[in-house]
């Protein structure tokens, strides 16, 4: 009998960007993002983009976060005072 255990962890992090606070709650199953919620006091245009970012991250491995964030910003998303690196830092797991 072989038992296969994966580590299930919840993380919550606040990251202060130049012009806003990013709040992230991550539900990880091993190194995969099972669920994610991003909120904060920053502006993002188009306004529904945050949902798209969460959808892009959900199900991906944490090693792919940098690439996903950069791809997301390459789609024309604008976040005044908040840089792609701010989201990468907010999503960085200890």
From Swiss-Prot:
GO MF annotations in UniProt: ATP binding; lipoate-protein ligase activity
InterPro entries hit by this protein: Lipoate_protein_ligase_C (IPR019491), Octanoyltrans_LipM/LipL (IPR050664)
One Pfam family of this chain: Lip_prot_lig_C
One GO process term, biological-process aspect: protein lipoylation
Gene Ontology CC terms: protein-containing complex
Catalytic activity, EC: 6.3.1.20
Highest taxon listed in the record's lineage: Archaea
Biochemical pathway: Protein modification; protein lipoylation via exogenous pathway; protein N(6)-(lipoyl)lysine from lipoate: step 1/2; Protein modification; protein lipoylation via exogenous pathway; protein N(6)-(lipoyl)lysine from lipoate: step 2/2
Enzyme class: ligase
Keyword set, alphabetical order: ATP-binding, Ligase, Nucleotide-binding
Catalytic activity line of the entry: L-lysyl-[lipoyl-carrier protein] + (R)-lipoate + ATP = N(6)-[(R)-lipoyl]-L-lysyl-[lipoyl-carrier protein] + AMP + diphosphate + H(+)
Function: Part of a lipoate-protein ligase complex that catalyzes both the ATP-dependent activation of exogenously supplied lipoate to lipoyl-AMP and the transfer of the activated lipoyl onto the lipoyl domains of lipoate-dependent enzymes. Can also use octanoate as substrate.
Subunit composition and interactions: Heterodimer composed of LplA and LplB.
Extra information: In contrast to E.coli, where the lipoate-protein ligase is encoded by a single gene product (LplA) with a large N-terminal domain and a small C-terminal domain, the same activity in T.acidophilum is dependent on two separate proteins, corresponding to the two domains of E.coli LplA, respectively.
Stated name of the protein: Lipoate-protein ligase A subunit 2
């Amino acid at each position: 009998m072989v038992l296969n255990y994966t580590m299930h962890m919840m993380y919550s992090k606040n990251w202060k960007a130049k012009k806003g606070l990013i709040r992230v709650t991550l539900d990880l199953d091993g190194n995969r993002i099972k669920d994610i919620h991003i909120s904060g006091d920053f502006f993002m245009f188009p306004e529904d983009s945050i949902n798209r970012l969460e959808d892009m991250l959900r199900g991906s491995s944490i090693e792919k976060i940098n690439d996903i964030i950069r791809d997301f910003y390459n789609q024309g998303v604008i976040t005044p005072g908040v840089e792609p690196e701010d989201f990468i830092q907010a999503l960085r797991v200890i």
